[in-house]
Amino acid sequence: MRASYMFTSESVSEGHPDKVCDRISDEVVDLFFREGPKAGISPWAIRAACETLATTNKVVIAGETRGPASVTNDQIESVVRAAIKDIGYEQEGFHWETCDIEILLHPQSADIAQGVDALQPGTNQEEGAGDQGIMFGYATNETPDLMPAPIFYAHKILRLISEARHSGKEKVLGPDSKSQVTIQYENGKPVGVREIVVSHQHLVEDMTSAHVRERVEPYVRQALPADWITDKTIWHINPTGKFYIGGPDGDTGLTGRKIIVDTYGGAAPHGGGAFSGKDPTKVDRSAAYASRYLAKNIVAAGLADRCTLQLAYAIGVARPLSIYIDTHGTGKVSEDKLEKAVAEAMDLTPRGIRTHLDLNKPIYARTSSYGHFGRTPDADGGFSWEKTDLADALKRAV
């Protein structure tokens, strides 16, 4: 890698149209996991593949599910409206109370289910992967959360503004926003910020870019290391001059269109599969979480400064087809040893991942904005893939 360079990543807020859709899709997944046990259905039997489209005064939800019959369209609609309200949409072109919601969910294909379900419940018959695909995990020691600095700080800027908006401190700012941070690296380490972009919806129509900068600049400075912003840092705040019409009214949203924001901001490869709206039999989601977990634990164990890890699966096949690790020249042991160590330390079948990371829970709506990675593990099992509890086992295995 070059010693000196610039790298840029972006983030978007929970009110971005695509993120509204991710949130809705994950709310449906959580609903099925919450209601399943009440109906006596095992969480292992829950299936959800939910896609959402949101546009002016309209939400369309489509996909395949398997779960309790007690989950009705009225219940789904109620959950969706509550999510839109929580995000903050009460504008003429998209209001949580009045937008039309169309629900087009149907049972999962039997052809897909036969390759995923255990053939003989209660036996050791393995569950296969829900689809073929490749998944990547990544970690680097350049931030405390072992995430790349550009995406780490792009998320942090918008999270701080969002917290202020929800608290009522920033009543003139709307839910829809984007950030972008260009980080200067020297000797492979982040040392400063060259460019800052924030585009933020405002609820007062005649606000100028200067007015918006007055509102958001304190949060940008709070998010970034103090000495990283200098007189050479270039600011772009609402560079088009006006951002009054926001959210799905201004730009149609779809589930799964922010996969780089969801992961590593472009600093690592991506297998192409989105996360939101999918239950953990879908290895697009669960194996990507496992890949991050393993890469993070390798770095946390001091076995490498950077780590990229790839897993590959085939539909209906339980074991991963391949495990690949690249420590980018920073490894303290060989990649071959690390590949063997991760296979010994964790069962990487779909059932093994779901068990190890405790994924059969309603923990997904919270992942739908500000990244699935670099988050703090929750007491109820949310963000379990961010734990570093495998580090000691990996050190012993090598």
From Swiss-Prot:
<feature type="binding site">
    <location>
        <position position="18"/>
    </location>
    <ligand>
        <name>Mg(2+)</name>
    </ligand>
</feature>
<keyword id="KW-0067">ATP-binding</keyword>
<dbReference type="InterPro" id="IPR002133">
    <property type="entry name" value="S-AdoMet_synthetase"/>
</dbReference>
<dbReference type="InterPro" id="IPR022628">
    <property type="entry name" value="S-AdoMet_synt_N"/>
</dbReference>
<dbReference type="Pfam" id="PF02772">
    <property type="entry name" value="S-AdoMet_synt_M"/>
</dbReference>
<comment type="pathway">
    <text>Amino-acid biosynthesis; S-adenosyl-L-methionine biosynthesis; S-adenosyl-L-methionine from L-methionine: step 1/1.</text>
</comment>
<feature type="binding site" description="in other chain">
    <location>
        <begin position="257"/>
        <end position="258"/>
    </location>
    <ligand>
        <name>ATP</name>
    </ligand>
</feature>
<keyword id="KW-0547">Nucleotide-binding</keyword>
<keyword id="KW-0963">Cytoplasm</keyword>
<feature type="binding site">
    <location>
        <position position="251"/>
    </location>
    <ligand>
        <name>ATP</name>
    </ligand>
</feature>
<feature type="binding site">
    <location>
        <position position="274"/>
    </location>
    <ligand>
        <name>ATP</name>
    </ligand>
</feature>
<keyword id="KW-0808">Transferase</keyword>
<feature type="binding site" description="in other chain">
    <location>
        <begin position="176"/>
        <end position="178"/>
    </location>
    <ligand>
        <name>ATP</name>
    </ligand>
</feature>
<feature type="binding site">
    <location>
        <position position="51"/>
    </location>
    <ligand>
        <name>K(+)</name>
    </ligand>
</feature>
<dbReference type="GO" id="GO:0000287">
    <property type="term" value="F:magnesium ion binding"/>
</dbReference>
<feature type="binding site" description="in other chain">
    <location>
        <position position="64"/>
    </location>
    <ligand>
        <name>L-methionine</name>
    </ligand>
</feature>
<dbReference type="InterPro" id="IPR022631">
    <property type="entry name" value="ADOMET_SYNTHASE_CS"/>
</dbReference>
<comment type="function">
    <text>Catalyzes the formation of S-adenosylmethionine (AdoMet) from methionine and ATP. The overall synthetic reaction is composed of two sequential steps, AdoMet formation and the subsequent tripolyphosphate hydrolysis which occurs prior to release of AdoMet from the enzyme.</text>
</comment>
<feature type="region of interest" description="Flexible loop">
    <location>
        <begin position="108"/>
        <end position="118"/>
    </location>
</feature>
<keyword id="KW-0479">Metal-binding</keyword>
<feature type="binding site" description="in other chain">
    <location>
        <begin position="242"/>
        <end position="243"/>
    </location>
    <ligand>
        <name>ATP</name>
    </ligand>
</feature>
<feature type="binding site" description="in other chain">
    <location>
        <position position="282"/>
    </location>
    <ligand>
        <name>L-methionine</name>
    </ligand>
</feature>
<keyword id="KW-0554">One-carbon metabolism</keyword>
<dbReference type="GO" id="GO:0005524">
    <property type="term" value="F:ATP binding"/>
</dbReference>
<dbReference type="Pfam" id="PF00438">
    <property type="entry name" value="S-AdoMet_synt_N"/>
</dbReference>
<keyword id="KW-0460">Magnesium</keyword>
<feature type="binding site">
    <location>
        <position position="251"/>
    </location>
    <ligand>
        <name>L-methionine</name>
    </ligand>
</feature>
<dbReference type="GO" id="GO:0006556">
    <property type="term" value="P:S-adenosylmethionine biosynthetic process"/>
</dbReference>
<dbReference type="GO" id="GO:0005737">
    <property type="term" value="C:cytoplasm"/>
</dbReference>
<dbReference type="InterPro" id="IPR022636">
    <property type="entry name" value="S-AdoMet_synthetase_sfam"/>
</dbReference>
<dbReference type="InterPro" id="IPR022630">
    <property type="entry name" value="S-AdoMet_synt_C"/>
</dbReference>
<comment type="similarity">
    <text>Belongs to the AdoMet synthase family.</text>
</comment>
<dbReference type="InterPro" id="IPR022629">
    <property type="entry name" value="S-AdoMet_synt_central"/>
</dbReference>
<dbReference type="GO" id="GO:0006730">
    <property type="term" value="P:one-carbon metabolic process"/>
</dbReference>
<dbReference type="Pfam" id="PF02773">
    <property type="entry name" value="S-AdoMet_synt_C"/>
</dbReference>
<feature type="binding site">
    <location>
        <position position="278"/>
    </location>
    <ligand>
        <name>ATP</name>
    </ligand>
</feature>
<comment type="subunit">
    <text>Homotetramer; dimer of dimers.</text>
</comment>
<dbReference type="GO" id="GO:0004478">
    <property type="term" value="F:methionine adenosyltransferase activity"/>
</dbReference>
<feature type="binding site" description="in other chain">
    <location>
        <position position="108"/>
    </location>
    <ligand>
        <name>L-methionine</name>
    </ligand>
</feature>
<keyword id="KW-0630">Potassium</keyword>
<protein>
    <recommendedName>
        <fullName>S-adenosylmethionine synthase</fullName>
        <ecNumber>2.5.1.6</ecNumber>
    </recommendedName>
</protein>
<feature type="binding site" description="in other chain">
    <location>
        <position position="16"/>
    </location>
    <ligand>
        <name>ATP</name>
    </ligand>
</feature>
